[in-house]
Amino acid sequence: AAINHRFVQELFDGTIENKVLKDYLIQDYHFFDAFLSMLGACVAHADQLESKLRFAKQLGFLEADEDGYFQKAFKELKVSENDYLEVTLHPVTKAFQELMYSAVSSSDYAHLLVMLVIAEGLYLDWGSKDLALPEAYIHSEWINLHRGPFFAEWVQFLVDELNRVGKGLEDLTELQERWNQAVALELAFFDIGYDA
């Protein structure tokens, strides 16, 4: 459903309204905060050194590339620091944050991986659409951050880790519940910019 969402179509077409993109990015910046906490928790709780190092590498990428995009996009969209830091969170953003922070506080690597596979896998799905990129930086760069060999390798790493860790678990009920909640929230997140 997300791959054909109105938000994705308009982003690729370059026709998404600035207000819609602005509202989405402001909320996504708060998602980004909790997302970084999940990656940090994975560095702490992954069961193999190689895995810890891969998460550390991704944290460096996010600091340089993704946060850089947010700062440039906010400037272009004329969003002040106060506007994106001191904002009322949308109920979907709040619910997503709570789900992510509950994974962090669980200290459970498998629960963290479920959240990451959903978040990143869904974005790879729509980011990899075989369509021409829009001209504007604020549109094309958000797509570029979620496609290409580096991002695809990252998502495959997450899937492989979840498969590896999940094989040793007897009861997958809680993981399945978390998975279902995360999928529903990811889909609802695309509607944020259109709600106002």
Model-derived regions: residue spans:
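Acidic interhelical loop/turn segments
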Residues: 133-140, 163-173
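Alpha-helical bundle segments that constitute or directly flank the non-heme di-iron/ferroxidase center
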Residues: 1, 15-45, 65, 114-124, ...
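Active-site-proximal alpha-helical scaffolds that flank and shape metal-associated catalytic sites
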Residues: 26, 50-153, 180, 184
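Long hydrophobic alpha-helical segments typical of transmembrane helices together
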Residues: 167-196
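Short alpha-helical hairpin
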Residues: 1-16, 35, 157-168
